[in-house]
């Protein structure tokens, strides 16, 4: 019996380009959706741009355009990238749509009527220059606990303390630099704790990934909190009904964007929207997401749906991050690759295959090893799969006018290939794509061994062996057809070219139907080898792209610094006070971003006779920390080690500037050595 399913991908933020990290999720979901279609299931695949929030509002203002213009351009770019990678969405929409506004407003009113919306007056920092309330991330100042400077408004990344933005010492607006004032404002909260029982039951259902279920248990033990779903004007988003100058927080209307995109599809095609979203729906709902947004999709989203008497997701499938050559994607190394850059140089099917060969059902990071990428694509797709067709097709075309034999040369081998159909299907269904690829390639090896053993090039030279030659080559092509059918969800473009050659549609139902006595088209090249020079071209273009961006940012940084008022000189100290500081020259051995922190870089420093680890809050100023390797810095060497949230920091690196992106490391003339004392 055919299943009815709705599948979504997380909504890309309309404030930046699609990169290969995004593509992992969309390729994973697309393979799963294409497989379900091949199995005859009724499935709909939708997505949208996440188009609201303060960052979009500020970026648009910076560019001198409206937020609507910004998100329109982003959507066009995103759609082109996904089309380039053959992501087969049935609909791609935007959260800044009439459908989303209507559904968001309706759900809010339902939650309010059911008693799940609370309100209370809170105190917030307000930028008097920009005339706007400041979200926590747009307030910076000195930590009230450890006195570390340039900390965000909700937590210190040096001592890991949490606090209110009002507790910051010398707070300033990260937008204008102005000193904020305190103003009161009424905010609206979603009563998440009310849904703890339902969420626990949903967690125990056994359908969620074990990693998600375990993480949810940790959140339950920590205690669920009411969720602030409102933001004050100015804000780019939907206004809250009956609340002047209040807007829905972006994370409220973002997941509702799944519903809005599907509603847009339903309105265009006549599908029954309610059938998929009503509380007792018998359809299936799946969300593919990254591990960084599990919190919203496993707590807030199902609770909101339940509070509105709607169905909950059947499952939430989370995946890990993409690394390149074992490390985080890097702009300076050219591995922070945008989808559009990749598509200029490399066939998208290459990446689809490589990701599929490594994807499993767990929440694990996937490493794109560039050397392995080239080797695996050429070995599996070109040398094994496509070569299987080409080495047999030439004989069929030249000697038999494209006509295949009337019967199978090796029925047992064909039956062995067909027998793996349900196992391969199970691997696809369970998102164990790596296992499916491994099994398919094992069959591909057997198919090539069959051809090697039969040696049609030898048979072709023997008198009176035409029937045997036709049978062997037809068998090779038949096995290629089966393999291509299994790989169609992963390689849709190659499958389309194979269908043109075989003159038949590749479906799961007809896998076991051999092409006996039928004609195939003249063979044309199906796939090109992946060359290292193509990888190099992508890397170099990526480096150039971000070098140009950094140059422009550096120019703006200098201009901003020149226009910044000089801070007043601090109170006088004695020479004895200064003598207490032991300043040393240190050489940077390694430097990397702390993934869990918005601010910290982790340095390994050489001080001549020993090494130290130092955590420094200069991440915003140095987007490419690996470029600092080999550089000399000045550090306070006799500062007591400090145990921080992300490790122990054994000193302090000196820098100048007002904070955030306006920080500059101090350096010295040539000839200095690690460990030299600064006097």
Swiss-Prot record:
It catalyses: tRNA(Met) + L-methionine + ATP = L-methionyl-tRNA(Met) + AMP + diphosphate. SUPFAM superfamilies: Anticodon-binding domain of a subclass of class I aminoacyl-tRNA synthetases, Methionyl-tRNA synthetase (MetRS), Zn-domain, Nucleic acid-binding proteins, Nucleotidylyl transferase. A motif ('KMSKS' region) lies at residues 328-332. One of its GO terms (molecular function) is ATP binding. Keywords: Aminoacyl-tRNA synthetase, ATP-binding, Cytoplasm, Ligase, Metal-binding, Nucleotide-binding, Protein biosynthesis, RNA-binding, tRNA-binding, Zinc. InterPro entries: aa-tRNA-synth_I_CS, Anticodon_Met, Met-tRNA-synth_bsu_C, Met-tRNA_ligase_1, Met-tRNA_synth, Methionyl/Leucyl_tRNA_Synth, MetRS_core, MetRS_Zn. Its cofactor is Zn(2+). Binds 1 zinc ion per subunit. PROSITE patterns: AA_TRNA_LIGASE_I (PS00178), TRBD (PS50886). A motif ('HIGH' region) lies at residues 12-22. GO terms for cellular component: cytosol. It holds the Pfam family tRNA-synt_1g. Its EC number is 6.1.1.10. Homodimer. Belongs to the class-I aminoacyl-tRNA synthetase family. MetG type 1 subfamily. Is required not only for elongation of protein synthesis but also for the initiation of all mRNA translation through initiator tRNA(fMet) aminoacylation. This is Methionine--tRNA ligase.
């Amino acid at each position: 019996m055919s299943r009815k399913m709705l599948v979504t991908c997380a909504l890309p933020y309309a404030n930046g380009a699609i990169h290969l990290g995004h593509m992992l999720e969309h390729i994973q979901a697309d393979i799963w959706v294409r497989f379900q279609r091949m199995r005859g299931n009724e499935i709909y695949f939708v997505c949208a741009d996440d188009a609201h929030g303060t960052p979009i509002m500020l970026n648009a203002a910076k560019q001198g355009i409206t937020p609507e213009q910004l998100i329109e351009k982003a959507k066009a770019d995103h759609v082109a990238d996904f089309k380039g990678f053959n992501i087969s969405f049935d609909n791609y929409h935007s959260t800044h749509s009439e459908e989303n506004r209507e559904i968001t407003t309706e759900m809010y009113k339902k939650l309010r009527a059911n008693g799940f919306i609370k309100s209370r007056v809170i105190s917030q920092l307000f930028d008097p220059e920009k005339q706007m309330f400041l979200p926590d991330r747009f307030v910076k100042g000195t930590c009230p606990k450890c006195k570390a400077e340039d900390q965000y408004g909700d937590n210190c990344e040096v001592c890991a303390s949490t606090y209110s933005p009002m507790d910051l010492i010398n707070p300033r607006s990260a937008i204008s630099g102005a000193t904020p004032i305190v103003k009161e404002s009424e905010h609206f909260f979603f009563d998440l704790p009310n849904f703890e029982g339902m969420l626990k039951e949903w967690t125990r259902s056994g359908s969620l990934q074990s990693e998600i279920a375990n993480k949810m248990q940790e959140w339950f033990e920590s205690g669920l909190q009411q969720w602030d779903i409102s933001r004050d004007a100015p804000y780019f988003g939907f206004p809250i009904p009956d609340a002047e100058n209040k807007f829905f927080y972006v994370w409220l209307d973002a997941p509702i964007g799944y519903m809005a995109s599907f509603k847009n599809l339903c309105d265009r095609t006549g599908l029954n929207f309610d059938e998929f979203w009503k509380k007792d729906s018998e359809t299936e709902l799946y969300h593919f997401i990254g591990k960084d947004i599990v919190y919203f999709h496993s707590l807030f989203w199902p609770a909101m749906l339940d509070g509105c008497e709607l169905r909950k997701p059947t499952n939430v499938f989370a995946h890990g991050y993409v690394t390149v050559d074992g490390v985080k994607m890097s702009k300076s190394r050219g591995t922070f690759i945008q989808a559009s850059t990749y598509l200029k140089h490399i066939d998208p099917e290459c990446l689809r295959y490589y990701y599929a060969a490594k994807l499993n059902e767990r929440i694990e990071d996937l490493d794109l090893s560039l050397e392995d990428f080239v080797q695996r694509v050429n070995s599996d797709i070109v040398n094994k799969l496509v070569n299987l067709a080409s080495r047999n097709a030439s004989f069929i075309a030249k000697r038999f006018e494209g006509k295949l034999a009337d019967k199978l040369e090796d029925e047992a081998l064909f039956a062995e290939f067909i027998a793996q159909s349900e196992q391969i299907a199970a691997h696809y269904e369970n998102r164990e794509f790596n296992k499916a690829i491994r099994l398919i390639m094992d069959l591909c090896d057997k198919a090539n061994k069959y051809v090697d053993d039969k040696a049609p090039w030898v048979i072709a030279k023997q008198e009176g062996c035409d029937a045997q030659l036709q049978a062997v080559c037809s068998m090779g092509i038949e096995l290629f057809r089966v393999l291509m059918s299994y790989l169609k969800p992963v390689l849709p473009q190659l499958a389309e070219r194979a269908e043109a050659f075989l003159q038949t549609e590749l479906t799961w139902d007809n896998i076991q139907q051999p092409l006996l006595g039928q004609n195939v088209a003249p063979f044309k090249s199906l796939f090109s080898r992946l060359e290292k020079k193509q990888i190099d071209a992508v890397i170099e273009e990526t480096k150039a792209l971000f070098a140009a961006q950094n140059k422009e940012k550096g120019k703006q940084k200098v201009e901003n610094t020149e226009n910044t008022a000089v801070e007043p000189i601090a109170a006088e100290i004695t020479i004895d006070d200064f003598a207490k500081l032991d300043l040393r020259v240190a050489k940077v051995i390694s430097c990397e971003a702390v993934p869990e922190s918005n601010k910290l870089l982790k340095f390994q420093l050489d001080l001549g006779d020993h090494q130290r680890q130092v955590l420094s809050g200069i991440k915003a100023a140095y987007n490419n920390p690996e470029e600092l390797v080999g550089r000399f810095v000045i550090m306070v060497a006799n500062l007591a080690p400090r145990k921080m949230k992300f490790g122990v920091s054994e000193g302090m690196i000196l820098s100048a500037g007002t904070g955030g992106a306006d920080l500059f490391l101090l350096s010295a003339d040539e000839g200095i050595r690690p460990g030299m004392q600064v006097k």
